[in-house]
């Protein structure tokens, strides 16, 4: 399962024997749109968030699950029931720009202060002093930033795929442009606003179908435009990570929201770099980091420098960790939470 990370604490809270034990069927039933809970709309921090819940409000320990890009709260469908059965109040927002949540037109409305402010306002709405926050992909980046900006409101951190990224001496997009070129998608989203949005909107089904794949054959590194061109590929590579009915949930969601709101998160990376200039960069909360060994996102070699209380799990999967290996992901989360209760 696990390849050790150089110069990094190694602890796999999920023994092989534990991972082989099946989760009770009643905790693994939310696997399609008809099983997924109906949303509430909660006004917080100047926006309306579409929020899905499991468990009893105020009757369990709060845990907030934060999706990535291009995703939706539905990405957590396999984890919600199991966490609720373990006594948690599970709160899963479509963050601003996604689903039926508000989509402000001002690009700066998607910076880390606004995104983390939404989550803090959700805690205030429910009357919680703090919560455990779980993030995948861009959701992980939001949870890292949230923990830096509001450390007293974060009890524990669980992040998937994207590790803590140190701030560095130069703004992130400037660094990426120098290293990867101006057609790298992070840079392209910032330097050519609206272009990628239009391509994704015009090829919504193909883009999402081609994105949500696993076991994609190895290939030579592609130019930075490869992600944008993915929207135009007629025959996808690898295998799908979800059923057609599940894919329909994401396609319908982006038909309603478009892609601009989510891409605006990327357009605030340099702004976020400035906003985080004066915060303490060390995260002290107990943290679980879950990597996919086949993920193209690189593992951090300096994680314990900035997150000293981290434990690491490596799963044999790609980027869409909680959807590719839902049972193993849920078990890793539940056992770690039990150990840190």
Predicted regions and their residues:
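Catalytic active-site module of serine/aspartate enzymes centered on a nucleophile-bearing elbow/loop
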Residues: 11-19, 310-341
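Active-site loop/turn elements of alpha/beta-hydrolase fold enzymes
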Residues: 95, 162, 317
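Conserved HGGG/HGGXW glycine-rich cap/lid loop of the alpha/beta-hydrolase fold
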Residues: 47-102
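Conserved beta-strand scaffold positions in the cores of enzyme catalytic domains, especially
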Residues: 39-41, 90-92, 289, 312-314
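Active-site helix-initiating loop/hinge in glycosyltransferases
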Residues: 68, 111, 324-325
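Flexible "cap/lid" subdomain of the alpha/beta-hydrolase fold that forms the substrate-access gate
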Residues: 31-38, 48-49, 55-57, 62, ...
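Short, Lys/Arg-enriched N-terminal segments with co-localized hydrophobic residues
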Residues: 20-29
């Amino acid at each position: 399962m696990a390849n050790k990370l150089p110069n990094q604490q190694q602890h796999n809270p999920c023994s092989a024997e534990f991972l082989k034990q099946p989760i009770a069927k009643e905790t693994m039933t939310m696997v399609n749109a008809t099983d997924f809970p109906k949303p509430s709309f909660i006004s917080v921090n100047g926006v309306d968030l579409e929020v899905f819940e499991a468990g009893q409000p105020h009757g369990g320990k709060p845990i907030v699950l934060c999706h990535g890009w291009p995703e939706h709260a539905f990405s957590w469908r396999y984890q919600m029931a199991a966490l609720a059965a373990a006594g948690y109040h599970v709160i899963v927002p479509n963050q601003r720009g996604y689903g039926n949540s508000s989509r402000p037109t001002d690009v700066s409305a998607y910076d880390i202060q606004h995104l983390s402010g939404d989550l803090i306002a959700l805690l205030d709405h429910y009357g919680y002093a703090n919560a455990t926050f779980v993030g995948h992909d861009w959701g992980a980046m939001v949870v890292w930033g949230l923990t830096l900006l509001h450390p007293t409101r974060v009890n524990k951190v669980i992040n998937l795929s994207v590790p803590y990224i140190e701030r560095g001496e130069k703004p992130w997009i400037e660094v990426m442009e120098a290293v990867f070129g101006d057609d790298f998608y992070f840079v392209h989203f910032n330097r050519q606003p609206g272009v990628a949005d239009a391509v994704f909107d015009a090829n919504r089904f193909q883009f999402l179908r081609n994105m949500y794949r696993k076991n994609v054959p190895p290939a030579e590194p592609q130019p930075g435009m490869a992600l944008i061109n993915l929207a135009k590929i007629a025959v996808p590579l690898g295998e799908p990570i979800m059923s057609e009915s599940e894919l329909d949930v994401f396609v319908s969601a982006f038909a309603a929201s478009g892609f601009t709101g989510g891409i605006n998160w990327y357009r605030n990376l340099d702004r976020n770099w400035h906003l985080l200039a004066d915060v303490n960069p060390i995260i002290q909360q107990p943290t679980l980091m879950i990597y996919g060994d086949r993920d193209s996102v690189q593992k951090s070699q300096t994680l314990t420098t900035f997150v000293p209380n981290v434990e690491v799990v490596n799963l044999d999967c790609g980027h869409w960790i909680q959807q590719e290996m839902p049972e193993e992901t849920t078990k890793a989360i539940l056992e770690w939470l039990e150990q840190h209760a």
